[in-house]
From Swiss-Prot:
Residues 437-463, 1355-1423 are annotated as: Disordered. GO terms for molecular function: guanyl-nucleotide exchange factor activity; small GTPase binding. WD repeats lie at residues 64-103, 304-343. Belongs to the RIC1 family. Residues 437-448, 1379-1397 have a biased composition (Polar residues). This is Guanine nucleotide exchange factor subunit RIC1. It comes from Homo sapiens. GO terms for biological process: cranial skeletal system development; intracellular protein transport; negative regulation of protein catabolic process; positive regulation of GTPase activity; regulation of extracellular matrix constituent secretion; retrograde transport, endosome to Golgi. Its main location: cytoplasm.
């Protein structure tokens, strides 16, 4: 509603003695001038600019006679000021203008500037006037004056002798006697006033009073703390004609403030609270409306230590009240008690170092024009002694503080047509929450407030029409789009009175003192009247509204002295020539637009409906307005000023289903009128015969139905929101009426629809009013999105930038910098809960189902469950009819039931879990439901619940179920958590945090995170688990870390063995199902020690039973195409090996993705080593390796010049380190030289492309080579054969042949390989001839293999070359300790030369070993 902005400003008064410091400020009725009182001084200040104009100083002699000045009161026309003094005198000062055309301050413009001296009202608006103060009259009332109050043309004065004086402004009593309060009868209401009691004691007098014009009486506070309301029975103001009413329960009143618009009397009390009363229309009694008080919950340390209420002031628009206390502090409240600001907490009360500040004490305050400023005279009071010396220097030059505010448009223009956007207006700028919209429409334009612009989002204007703007637009960020109001318009029309935004959020119009101006968010331009005389000739009286591209406003024409209704087109020039003008009979107070109708409320208490339509006659487009209907409201409205808002709505007590013509349901069904906080509805009277208009004559459409007598819908209403949009899916929300009720929160008048369009019961209500509390002040409602938008003050401390003794910067130390932030809140859970409380579960279900697509709907259900649980489970008394079972049953209707319950439980303390699960069901059953629904993450959350509520055995049992399911589904993160969880259960701990990674040199990790070293094969103790990143400096196959004590003291830990058994079982199942890809992911993600396990399972699970099935499954899993025979292969020179070396190197170069050489040094020593290693491998051992995944793109690379050997980049294939086919820079010499003499024919290129096409994706190739290496190290030669067949590389077969020749290999395995290859050969002959060429190539190796098999090597004799013991006797990580001279995957003939192999190549291969299966996506990337 109202929000503080920035720091307060300080206005310095003339230097004088501390005794002359100001203590009272009072604005004139127009709030253009301020009277400031000191003990013997009266000063007049101007509001804009805020400057001192004139000061009257009382001579010392007369000052002694009169006593010090106390209070000041302005005459309604601002020509006189009455000042009361301590000795009972009233001094009347006349304010006169200095003769001539002189001003105190004038703006100086350069020559040729557009501000012309001939502008109407130029001097009056731009210059501070020169005034004189002259004391004209002195009146002695012979008793201390307690209160002054201006009443119409008289001055009402209350004195301490218990008298009320009615004095004429010329200083005469007109012969009227003073009224003695003891003669005024008081009672609890007006009906019993004649027999009322008198005050009954002699020293009674009025301490404070204020006149209420709309109640025609005085709210008074007596010196004994009682409060009351005195009203004259007739127009005569005599003791006989006065009587009073008072509430019995207020005995500690201190001050009073009256709100004329809402007819409220706010009484400040000694307790620090404010009691707000209204008058009962029927009995005249004073009824308590609400209280304004700080709560212990919000302000635990200060709520009852504020002292008495000292001052209260309602804002000029009567929408907020500001309250101060005796011990300091300031708070701001809305009309019906919503707290907006309080300076007793947060950054206002505490410094940045945590020490407490003394609250600001306020001696006097007064609102400035339109509520943009609050003038405050502060008494710093008992400040800290360390800064008292600085404050003395401040007191020497007394000052006035100006607090700056920005406010919601709803305070002054509540009938704004766009109700889904928040628009705030400040003194010279506007804040709105749709800033991102314009950027996408016109990207070239840039805002001067670029810091308030969010990132570009989809334009909400794209769909056009009246559709709801997207959430991204209205909620996208916390910043505002700030529009600076045109300075040209402000100079002569300050202050801004009204503003409005159109339905699409593209255009804003503002109204100042005269005329109006509008701004486009798309073009970033203001449009002002070209003829300034036309602007200065109109005063907008009743606000303004947008209708499509038109601005509709009610104004007063000064020249013609005529009330008018005008319509201006946005796109045309701002000129009366393009306006449509309709004359009005009386002054328009409020204006609103609904669909194609304009509704106005006039000062004669009548409502007039107009139709508005677009007219395109001739070159100029205009809008035509015609009167449709007039409704007199004078019977129901005691004073026109009491009407806060008037709107046409489509809301009625009957739903569209029950109307005889459902299509009329969204038409103008009723008038909503906010009368002093009382919401009144007048519906169309459909009881008469003219319900249906059968003929479609346009004239008949003008015959509108009359309105029924008004019905009161709600009390204490501040704002109303409704929409005429229709949406069949969300009828509940769009046909509802939303009310803001201040401290009572919000209310919604919700329609109730029968299910499945059945006929409603006649005895059931078709609408229901549901109250609910929200934590923000609502400023807009997003109807479809079930959201309330608002704003909230935030503060920033800058006191640390200044030293304590720096008195000049004291304001920045005393006050935080205030900013306004956007906020929003979901309200759907409140409504659902209210419906369930009222046994309207069916309606709640319909409403919830219509909102189930909202992104925060799960949060809505969770909030509802959580709030009901907290309330009922913590209640001290038994609840006869608990709501929790109903809510639980309601939530089960939605698929998110399981998540909602567990999320609620996880956010609730453990003590409430039993109460929750007694209502929603046993957590074990819910866990099993999650497993059946394959919702493993939710099941994991239930596991934590079970761990706390059940014995460890039950937790372990359920954890095992979940772990096995997670393994099957490849949820690796969950698997890791489950392993930790299971281990924690076994060790009796509630939770075991993950081990902290040790520091590792980053030079060789290449940015990859490898999990293998985490060793989640948990038979070892936690302290032995190395958790570092994978060290590429170690040997390829085995990770680093002190894991040699694998079967050490913890080997009997049943929990670790239990987990290991599950991991082994899963690995065995994967291998038996030939799911090698899943096995690789499993090993890489969970750090499963695959090699050591395969060594043990070599003759069991790791044995290939059916080579053909394995081959087919690998082709399918790795997306590897079956080979085909190219048509040209018969004549291809490649087949005969003519260009085998060059072609092989070319193709192999394409398979060598440079990223795999993570940081392979291309230094000379490494090149030499690599060349020496490769020199031992003759080119004849290589076959064509076409392992490229890049397809046709790579063919271009064949034909482009290859990089020279001087390049720093290594292009060798890291994937082939397990064989002897790697290449480094040295080999490109041969390729480069041979390539220049080589000319490939078309058929040869076709052959190359065919070979490329028969390879699978690059990722698959990397993964297959990783697995090949693993199986080679583990000695699973049959799997190596299968992978070699898929890759179609005879070098792999050669390696296996070398291994079988050089070591004692299991004869059964060799026999299995031989049988398997024969089966593959048969299968290739019948089903897959594409394999035949490769099988023919490796025939010699197969024959050698047959010879070896016949030798029948003993099965147990096989050991990997590097292992001295069987795997059972060594640590699974023992491979790390092997020397570089032995490598299980290097053929025997190359073992000797492998000493020279760069260790970096092994590191690269190790990186490759771990990388392919890391994140389930198998993406390879270098960081």
């Amino acid at each position: 509603m109202y929000f503080l902005s920035g720091w307060p400003k300080r206005l310095l008064c003339p230097l004088g003695s501390p005794a002359e410091a100001p203590f009272h400020v009072q604005s004139d009725p127009q709030r253009a001038f301020f009277a400031v009182l000191a003990a013997a001084r009266l000063s007049i200040w101007y509001s804009r600019p805020s400057v001192l104009i004139v000061t009257y100083k009382e001579p010392a002699k007369s000052s002694t006679q009169f006593g010090s000045y106390k209070q000041a009161e302005w005459r309604p026309d601002s020509t006189m000021i009455a000042v009361s003094t301590a000795n009972g005198y009233i001094l009347f000062f006349h304010i006169t203008s200095t003769r001539g055309d002189k001003y105190l301050y004038e703006p100086v413009y350069p020559k040729g500037s557009p501000q012309m001296k001939g502008t109407p009202h130029f001097k009056e608006e731009q210059c501070a006037p020169a005034l004189n103060l002259e004391m004209r009259k002195i009146l002695d009332l012979q008793a201390p004056i307690m209160s002054l109050q201006s009443v119409l043309e008289d001055l009402l004065v209350a004195t301490s002798d218990g008298l009320l004086h009615l004095i004429h402004w010329e200083g005469m009593t007109n012969g009227r006697k003073a009224i003695n309060l003891c003669t005024v009868p008081f009672s609890v209401d007006l009906q019993s006033s004649r027999v009322g009691s008198f005050l009954g004691f002699t020293d009674v007098h009025i301490r404070d009073m204020e006149y209420c014009a709309t109640l025609d009486g005085f709210a008074v506070v007596f010196n004994d703390g009682k409060v009351g309301f005195i009203t004259p029975v007739s127009s005569r103001f005599t003791a006989e004609q006065l009587h009073g009413v008072w509430p019995q329960d207020v005995v500690d009143g201190t001050c009073v403030a009256v709100n004329n618009k809402y007819r409220l009397m706010a009484f400040g009390c000694v307790s620090g609270s404010v009691q707000v009363y209204t008058i009962d229309n029927s009995t005249g009694a004073m009824l308590l409306s609400h209280k304004l008080e700080l709560t212990a919950k919000q302000y635990p340390d200060i709520w009852n230590k504020t002292g008495a209420v000292k001052l209260m002031r309602w804002s000029p628009d009567n929408s907020v009240v500001i309250v101060t206390w005796e011990y300091g502090g300031l708070s701001l409240w809305s009309v019906f008690g919503a707290q907006l600001i309080c300076t007793l907490g947060g950054d206002f009360a505490y410094r940045s170092d945590g020490t407490k500040k003394d609250p600001l004490k306020i001696n006097s305050m007064s609102w400035g024009a339109e509520g943009y400023h609050l003038w405050v005279i502060s008494g710093f009071g008992s400040q800290n002694t360390e800064i008292e010396s600085d404050l003395r220097s401040v007191v020497k030059q007394p000052s006035i503080l100006l607090f700056q505010f920005i406010k919601s448009v709803l305070t002054v223009n509540p009938c704004m047509s766009n109700q889904e956007q928040v628009l705030l207006q400040g003194e010279d700028r506007l804040y709105l929450n749709c800033g991102e919209a314009s950027q996408t429409q016109n990207p070239r334009s840039s805002s001067t407030h670029s810091e308030h612009k969010p990132s570009r989002e989809k334009s909400p204007f794209a769909d056009g029409g009246l559709e709801s703007q997207g959430l991204s637009t209205l909620l996208g960020h916390r910043h505002w789009h700030v529009v600076q109001i045109s300075s040209t318009y402000l100079e002569s029309n300050w202050p801004i009175r009204f503003s409005a935004i159109d339905k699409l959020g593209q255009n804003i119009a503002v109204v100042g003192k005269f005329g109006f101006a509008h701004y486009s968010l798309l073009t970033k331009k203001w449009k002002l009247f070209g003829n300034i005389t036309q602007e200065q000739n109109m005063i907008v009286t009743g606000g303004l509204a947008w209708w499509n591209d038109f601005m509709v406003l009610a104004c007063y024409n000064i020249n013609d002295r005529q009330e008018e209704l005008r319509v201006y087109l946005r796109t045309s020039n701002l000129d009366n020539a393009f306006a449509h003008v309709t004359k009005a009979q009386a002054e328009t107070l409020l204006l609103s637009v609904f669909q194609d109708m304009v509704i106005v409320f006039r000062a004669d208490c009548s409502i007039c409906l107009y139709s508005i339509e677009r007219k395109s006659d001739g070159p100029n487009t205009t809008a035509g307005i015609q009167v449709l209907q007039e409704v007199s409201m004078s019977r129901y409205i005691p004073h026109p000023f009491l009407v806060v808002s008037v709107t046409l709505t489509s809301v009625s007590t009957e739903n569209g289903i029950t109307l005889k013509m459902p299509q009329q349901a969204r038409g103008a069904e009723s008038i909503m009128l906010n009368l002093a906080g009382q919401l009144i509805m007048m519906q169309r009277d459909r009881s008469g015969p003219q319900i249906r208009e059968k003929d479609s004559n346009p004239n008949n459409q003008r015959k509108l139905l009359p309105f029924c007598p008004p019905v009161v819908l709600a009390q204490s209403v501040e704002n109303v929101w409704t929409t005429c949009r229709a949406n069949k899916q969300k009828r509940h929300l769009l046909e509802a009426l939303w009310l803001s009720c201040g401290g009572a929160g919000m209310k919604v008048w919700l329609p109730l629809f029968p299910r499945d369009h059945r006929k409603p019961h006649s005895f059931l209500s078709q609408r229901i009013m549901l109250p609910f509390h929200i934590n923000i002040y609502p400023l807009a409602v997003l109807f479809e999105d079930a959201l309330v938008l608002g704003a909230v003050n935030d503060t920033l401390l800058y006191d640390s930038l200044y030293t304590r003794n720096n008195a000049r910067e004291q304001l920045e130390v005393l006050f935080p910098f205030c900013v306004v932030e956007r906020t929003s809140q979901i309200y759907l859970h409140h409504i659902l809960r209210q419906l369930l409380v009222r046994n309207l579960g069916e309606q709640a279900l319909l409403l919830a189902q219509s909102c189930a697509t909202l992104p925060y709907f799960p949060h809505v259900l969770e909030l509802m469950l959580h709030e009901v649980l907290e309330e009922e489970a913590t209640s001290r008394e038994p609840i006869p009819d608990p709501l929790l079972p109903t809510v639980a049953k309601f939530i089960t209707e939605f698929p998110l039931f399981l998540q909602t319950v567990v999320h609620c439980a996880r956010k609730t303390e453990y003590a409430l879990w039993n109460y929750l699960f007694a209502a929603v069901g046993n957590p074990k059953d819910l866990f099993e439901e999650c497993l059946m629904a394959q919702d493993l993450d939710t099941a994991a959350s239930y596991l934590i619940i079970l761990q706390n509520m059940e014995v460890p055995a039950v937790s372990r049992q359920h954890a095992t179920l979940l772990f096995n399911t997670a393994l099957e589904q490849g949820k690796w993160d969950l698997c890791r958590h489950m392993i930790r969880f299971l281990k924690a259960i076994g060790s009796g701990e509630s939770e075991t945090p993950p081990s902290t990674p040790t520091a590792q040199e980053p030079s060789s990790s290449g940015g990859f995170e490898f999990f293998r070293n985490r060793s989640i094969s948990l038979s070892q103790s936690a302290e032995n688990v190395p958790a570092s990143k994978f060290s590429l400096q170690k040997t390829l196959s085995m990770p680093s870390g002190p894991s040699g004590k694998r079967w050490s003291k913890d080997s009997d830990c049943a929990e670790n063995m239990y987990i290991d058994m599950m991991l082994w079982r899963h690995a065995r199942r994967l291998l038996e199902d030939v799911r090698l890809k899943d096995l690789g992911c499993f090993a890489a993600q969970l750090g499963f020690e695959l090699i050591s396990w395969l060594c043990k399972e070599r003759t069991r699970a790791a044995r290939v039973d059916n080579f053909v099935i394995a081959l087919k499954r690998l082709h399918k899993d790795f997306l590897w195409p079956l080979p085909i025979i190219p048509a040209s292969s018969i004549s291809s020179p490649f087949k005969n090996g003519k260009y085998r070396t060059v072609g092989e190197q070319l193709l192999k170069s394409q398979s060598a993705d440079p990223f795999l050489n993570l940081e392979m040094d291309a230094g000379i020593s490494n090149i030499q080593r690599s060349q020496s290693w490769l020199s031992n491998i003759g080119p004849t051992h290589h076959e064509i390796d076409t392992a490229s995944s890049h397809g046709p793109q790579m063919q271009d690379a064949f034909l482009s010049p290859l990089s020279n050997k001087g390049d720093e980049c290594s292009i060798g294939s890291a994937t082939d380190l397990t064989e002897s086919s790697s290449m480094v820079d040295g080999d490109w010499t041969m390729v480069d030289e041979n390539f220049s003499t080589l000319s490939l024919t078309q058929s040869e290129l076709e052959h190359i492309s065919m070979e490329l096409a028969s390879k699978g994706p690059h990722k698959s190739q990397v993964q297959l080579r990783y697995l090949l290496h693993i199986f080679m190290e583990a000695g699973c030669l049959d799997w190596c054969i299968v992978i070699g067949l898929i890759l179609r590389e005879s070098s792999i077969i050669n390696q296996i042949l070398v291994i079988t020749q050089s070591s004692e290999v299991d004869g059964e395995m060799l026999q299995n390989i031989k049988t398997g290859l024969h089966a593959v050969d048969r299968w290739a002959s019948t089903d897959c001839p594409g394999y035949k060429p490769f099988l023919n190539i490796i025939k010699p190796q197969l024959q050698k293999l047959s010879e070896i098999t016949e030798e029948q090597v003993q099965p147990d004799a096989f050991q990997p070359i590097t292992m001295g013991k069987t795997p059972e006797q060594t640590s699974p990580r023992a491979e790390e300790s092997r020397g570089s001279s032995s490598h299980g995957s290097i053929p025997q003939g190359e073992v000797g030369s492998s000493n020279m192999v760069s260790r970096k190549e092994e590191d690269t291969a190790q990186a490759e070993e771990e990388e392919p299966f890391q994140d389930g996506t198998y993406d390879c990337s270098v960081s």
